[in-house]
Amino acid sequence: MAKLIINEENKKSRIEPEIYGHFSEHLGRCIYEGIYVGEKSEIPNVNGMRTDVVDALKELKVPVLRWPGGCFADEYHWMDGIGPKEKRKKMINTHWGGVVEDNSFGTHEYMELCRQIGCKTYVNGNLGSGTVREMSEWVEYMTFEGVSPMADLRKENGHEAPWKVDYFGVGNENWGCGGNMTPEYYANEYRRYQTYVRNYHPDRPTKKICCGANVADYYWTKGVLNTAFDHAEQWHGFMDGLSLHYYVHPEGWEIKGSSTDFDADVWYKTLSKALYMETLIERHGAIMDEYDPDKKVGMIVDEWGTWYTCEPGTNPGFLYQQNTVRDALVAGITLNIFNKHSDRVKMAALAQMVNVLQSVLLTEGGQMIKTPTYHVMHMYRHHQGADLLESTLTGAGEIGSDEWKVPKITESVSMDKDGVITVTMNNLSVEASEKVEIQLANRGYHVVEARIVTDSDMHAHNTFEAPDTVTEKDFAAYEETENGVNVTMPANSVIELRLAK
C-alpha cells in the first residue's frame, strides 16, 4: 500500500488561481461558433456570447483568459477589430486553415466575454509584424481613462470607462511563428516594446509577459534572460513573467497519434510525456534562479495540453480533437505538477478553451458537451488561491512498459483560508486499482467531500449523443482512520478529497 504523508503545519507557496487559466485563439471553431455566435444567432446568447458556454466556464471558476493568440497574435492588428462590425477589415488567418477572419470578435467583445465569465484579462500583443506605436496605442485604448486620442476613440466606440488589462504578452513564440528571432534579438525587441506598454494606473498595473522557450530550448531561456537583465537587474529584466510552451504529442510532431484509438503502451507514453513537464519547469526554473533568485518573475506556462492528429473529416488547420479519460489523467498530472511548483509557476493556460486541442468544452450547432478535462479542472478548482502543503508519497512504485515507466500515483495537497484541505491524486495504471494510506500530522480531520473522474475503458469519452459517459461523480471507496483516510483508487482515475475538522 502506498502512503501519502501530509504535514498541514508546513504551508509552502500560494497556488495562484491563474495557474488554472485558459487560452482562446482565433483558430478553428474556438472563438467563432464555440464562444461567439453574434447577437442575431438563434443559439441563446448575451451580447453574442453563447449562454451555455459562459455558464459552464463560470462553474469552472476560470481565473484568466489569454487572447487573441497564439500565432494569430503576431499577425493581428487590433484596430481592424474595433468600431462597427460591418466596417471592420477582413484578413486571412494564414496560420490556421487560411480562412477569412472578419474581425467581428475584437477588443470590445473579448472584454465583454471576460466580464461575463468574471475572469482576469491576458492580452497578447503583436511584436512579430506590428509596430511599437501599434502596441502602445492598444494599451492606451484599453486602459487610459483621461483625454487622449485612443481613449477618445474607445469612448466613440461605446465604452466610456477603461478596462483592466491584468497581463500583457509582448509577442508570442517569437522563436518561431512570431518572427523566427534569435533570443538576443527578441530580448532587445522585448526591452524596446515593453517600454511603451505603459502602466497608466499604478494602483492597477498591467503585468508584462516576456516570450519564453518552446519545450527544452534552454538556450533561449538563457539568452533572453541574459539580454533582458543586462543593466536591468533592479527591474527584473523589465518583466513580470516568462512564458513556456509544451504540448504532449504521443507519437511525435509529424504524426501525433489518434485522440481515441490507442493501446496501453501509447497510454503510458502519453502520460510519461505529460510528466516531462516537471523536468522542464525544474530546468528552466534553475536558469531563472540564476537571474531572479527571489522569484520576482513568474513562470507562465501559457500553452499546455495534448495535441493529437485532428479528427477525420475535419479541417486540419482547425485542430479539433476528441478528449478521453487519457486527457483527464494528463490534466490531473499536469495540474499537480503546477501546484507542486507554485513557488515559480504563477500562471498557466490550457490550450484551448473550446473546440481546439485539449478543450474543456465541445460544441456542435446549439449543442455543448463538457469533456473529461473539464470535469478534472472543475474538481481541482478548490486549489485556486490555497496554500500548497508539504506532502510525501512513498511505496507507490512504477508501472508501464520498459520504455515508458510512470509512477503509479501523482498527488498534490493544499489548504484554503478556511482550513479545508484538498487532496488530488491520480492513478496512472490502465488496469489496476491502487490503495493509498493518507496520514495527517494532526487528528480530527474528516472527509467532507469526495469526487472522482474515471472509466474502466481508457478510450471513454463524451459525445453529443452520450454527453455524460465520463463525468464527475461522488466517490465512496475510502475509510476514515484515526489520523487520516485509506483510499482505494480505481484504474484510470483522478480523485479529489476535501478534509476538514
Enumerate the language-model features and the residues they cover:
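Active-site His/acidic residue clusters
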Residues: 248-268, 314
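Histidine-centered active-site/metal-ligand motif
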Residues: 245
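Non-catalytic accessory regions flanking glycosidase/transglycosidase catalytic cores in CAZymes
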Residues: 1-241, 277-310, 314-501
